[in-house]
């Protein structure tokens, strides 16, 4: 399971290894600049991936970002249906609980 990298760690890398930091930052920009899928759709795919992996922190981050981008609860629910089929009930429940922490009563 992917682990969340604390902001302090990122700042240390940025200060001590600026070239490496830039490469990673540029890669993230490149990843979300799809030619056929817009950033919101790519992040919906990423939400499915991190939910399937059971990474609750990443589910919360992606849900928050998606909501900021205007994703609807219905779109997020559609993703969770796919997660249920692909990952099973335990991972589905874990992801839904994380989403509820971010979205509250909107679900």
Swiss-Prot record:
Task: List where the protein spans the membrane.
Answer: none
Q: Pfam families, from UniProt?
A: CMD (PF02627)
Q: Mind listing the GO molecular function terms for this protein?
A: oxidoreductase activity; peroxiredoxin activity
Q: Record's Gene3D superfamilies?
A: AhpD-like
What protein name is recorded for this chain? Uncharacterized protein MJ1511
Organism of origin: Methanocaldococcus jannaschii (strain ATCC 43067 / DSM 2661 / JAL-1 / JCM 10045 / NBRC 100440) (Methanococcus jannaschii)
């Amino acid at each position: 399971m992917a682990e969340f990298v604390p902001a302090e760690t990122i700042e240390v890398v940025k200060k001590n290894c600026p070239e490496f930091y830039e490469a990673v930052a540029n890669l993230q920009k490149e990843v979300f600049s799809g030619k056929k899928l817009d950033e919101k759709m790519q992040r919906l795919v990423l939400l499915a991936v991190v939910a399937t992996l059971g990474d609750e922190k990443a589910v919360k981050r992606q849900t928050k970002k998606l909501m900021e981008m205007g994703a609807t609860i219905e779109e997020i629910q559609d993703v969770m249906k796919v997660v249920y089929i692909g990952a099973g009930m335990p991972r589905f429940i874990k992801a839904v609980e994380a989403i509820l922490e971010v979205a509250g009563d909107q679900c």
